Amino acid sequence: MYPIVKKRVLNETVTLMEVQAPLVARKAMPGQFIIFRIDEEGERVPLTIAGYDREKGTVTIIFQKVGYTTEKLDSLNEGDSLLDFVGPLGEPTKTEGIHRCAVIGGGLGVAIAYPQAKALHDAGAEVDLIVGFRNEHLIILKDELEAACTNLIIMTDDGSNGNKGFVTQALQKQIEDGRDYDTVIAIGPLPMMKAVSEMTRPLKIKTIVSMNPIMIDGTGMCGGCRLTVGGETKFACVDGPDFDGHLVDFDEAMARGRMFRAEEARAKEKHFCNLTGEAR
């Protein structure tokens, strides 16, 4: 069992948890992920490692309440335990050779962008961290983000905090203002990562995207997380999650991501009814 030692609500839909998992913490690196299971009847869910403390033996995860399992996870508190917490899985983010970069996080992707930006910043790279939220009430980890970069740019859809607009607009302005990036890292919704990759393609800026497709076993056996990258089949769990954004078939990835929306909605509705006793 893996005890939850800290729970922190970041906004109305996003929660941070620290989980006691010393073996995972000992080996974890930025960009890797874990797969957890709440109990014997639970599904296996992948979450990117948002942080780790090797001395305390803890791993930090950040999740958004979007379906049955994340709703159930959010109902747990400090002192409760998870049945399974497997990892670290996937390839860590490669920081070698990166000197001036833009790390872009959209929505919950900010939680994944944070450890990658911090690793690059700690390694001596000049990091512009561009993060986007719908409004100021959804902003998370602001203090941590400021400490993890050279320059923090906050974008909100409604202009309630930082600059009004989208992360792609902020990246475009940075490039137009003469920022000479050797690498761009984009993490977040597939349409955003696709837009960033299309923007940097003609400029020949190396672009890395973090892919989080449907995943079950995390070892490459089930094939659920397969992607087409450069015309070849890759598996996000073992070959990724980081890939060359100029080679990823985003349209295929988006189509696969929509495959089980109806089933996910029904599971969430059933969970709500079980919790409240209400019929919908």
Segments from the language model and where they lie:
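Local cysteine-cluster metal-coordination motifs and their immediate loop/turn environment
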Residues: 112, 190, 212-242, 271-278
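Short, surface-exposed secondary-structure boundary micro-motifs
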Residues: 39, 87-88, 230
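Structural signal for conserved beta-strand scaffold positions within catalytic alpha/beta enzyme cores
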Residues: 6, 51, 154-156, 209, ...
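A generic structural signal for residues embedded in beta-strands
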Residues: 36, 84-85, 227
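Short, Lys/Arg- and Gly-enriched loop/turn segments at beta-strand edges
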Residues: 42-51, 89-96, 237
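Short Fe-S-cluster ligation motifs
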Residues: 235-239, 243-280
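FNR/FR-type flavoprotein reductase catalytic core
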Residues: 71-216
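Ferredoxin-reductase
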Residues: 1-80
